[in-house]
Amino acid sequence: MVQKYFGTDGIRGKANSFPMTPDFAMKVGMAVGVLFRSQHQSRRVVIGKDTRLSGYMLENALVSGLTAAGMDVFLLGPVPTPAVAMLCRSLRADLGVMISASHNPFYDNGIKLFGPDGFKLSDDMEAKIEQLIDTDLSKSLASSAEIGSAKRVEGDIYRYIEYAKRTLPRDVRLDAVRIVVDCANGAAYKAAPRALWELGAEVFAIHDEPNGTNINQKCGSTDLSSLKRKVHEVRADVGIALDGDGDRVLIVDEKAQTVDGDQLIAVIAENWHKMGRLRCNGVVTTIMSNLGLERFLNGKGLDLIRTKVGDRYVVDAMRQKGYNVGGEASGHIVLSDFGTTGDGLVAALQILACMKESQNPMSQLCQRFEPVPQILKNVTIKNKNVLKKNPVKTAIDQAEKRLGKEARLVIRASGTEPVIRLMAEGDAREVLDTVVTELMDVITHHDTRVDCI
């Protein structure tokens, strides 16, 4: 299903440029309000946001649209995305809205939507919303007496903190654990340091002073350099890197080595399997997860199920098949025993619990497998249909044959950025380099603009 406005993670774009404009955000609010008012009784909406400057603008526009449609809005302020999903259920809301562009720079923003169960809306629901956005809704709005209200809710960030803390086993405390947490100047800047401190850790928070324009700026899960320096400086046991909206996490061990999402999934899956907590004898990841993870899990008698890229597709597969551990190499870790979406803080707490239980340093705990050589490249393009051109399709077919059955090639258009993402992995590094370089040349040659990154 090709969608007009929604990508793999909601609606996203540059702030004050279509579709992230106040008038379009108001249309989204109206469309969502009209749809949910007709299907639910409470007419209650919760809205959270990260720390981007444009969040205020889009928040007000959404409120205008939602209240015009007769919805009552509860404004949570800056909270992590998983907090919106959790509070949507806790506050018995019909709808949850998160204003965020996740790990993107401050000048981008986006709108993510959650249903009353705390799960992101399905493709079908998003398609219905798109139809309503393009419809004249003037006759479908609330009457003067039924216009909705809006109010700010204080203290709900502490409900999320308590929720996150409860995911840690009751017999586990973090006393004497030295932790550096990089909050990415984002939505988790209050919740993450506070939760870790309340659990007994010695906490060194960095990038916890958002100003509207410094979110994800040389910090967080997309840039670990300052976190690694701080871990080394204070001799920390572990560094935790969150992204702008707090739904993904990467770890830095005491040696300042990076631990990606695949390794974190391996740690949790192995630990939960030993404890009898791992359901369905396996995990769900995406086509981008390293082949080394699959080999590691298979060696433990566990399965690995792959989905399209995007944590929503991981969650969908987990729900359909009953798995309780899933995620992406980028750090989206979904643990359905606790929540309905990726949660960086909760995932980090599970890793810390594994560290305390094993009594091993993070470097020993988290290097569970040797990653298969993998090359990731982005090609900035103007026309995403370039992959449908026959010369490009032919080149991809030839590349797959050259790599053989023991390697993998993934080429896809990004759902959030104007780029083609190429991933090749296999045991022969030189072959991977050659194949990827040749494919990049073919793609750029057949696109109307050439710009590789």
Curated annotation (Swiss-Prot):
One of its GO terms (molecular function) is phosphomannomutase activity. Mg(2+) binds at residues 102, 243, 245, 247. Its cofactor is Mg(2+). The active site is at 102 (phosphoserine intermediate). One of its GO terms (biological process) is UDP-N-acetylglucosamine biosynthetic process. Coiled coil: none annotated. It is an enzyme of class 5 (isomerase). It catalyses: alpha-D-glucosamine 1-phosphate = D-glucosamine 6-phosphate. The keyword Cytoplasm does not apply. GO terms for cellular component: cytosol. It comes from the Bacteria. It holds the Pfam family PGM_PMM_III. Its EC number is 5.4.2.10. Keywords: Isomerase, Magnesium, Metal-binding, Phosphoprotein. InterPro entries: A-D-PHexomutase_a/b/a-I (IPR005844), A-D-PHexomutase_a/b/a-I/II/III (IPR016055), A-D-PHexomutase_a/b/a-II (IPR005845), A-D-PHexomutase_a/b/a-III (IPR005846), A-D-PHexomutase_C (IPR005843), A-D-PHexomutase_C_sf (IPR036900), A-D-PHexomutase_CS (IPR016066), Alpha-D-phosphohexomutase_SF (IPR005841). The keyword Phosphoprotein applies. Belongs to the phosphohexose mutase family. PANTHER family: PHOSPHOGLUCOMUTASE (ALPHA-D-GLUCOSE-1,6-BISPHOSPHATE-DEPENDENT), PHOSPHOHEXOSE MUTASE. This is Phosphoglucosamine mutase. It comes from Bartonella tribocorum (strain CIP 105476 / IBS 506).
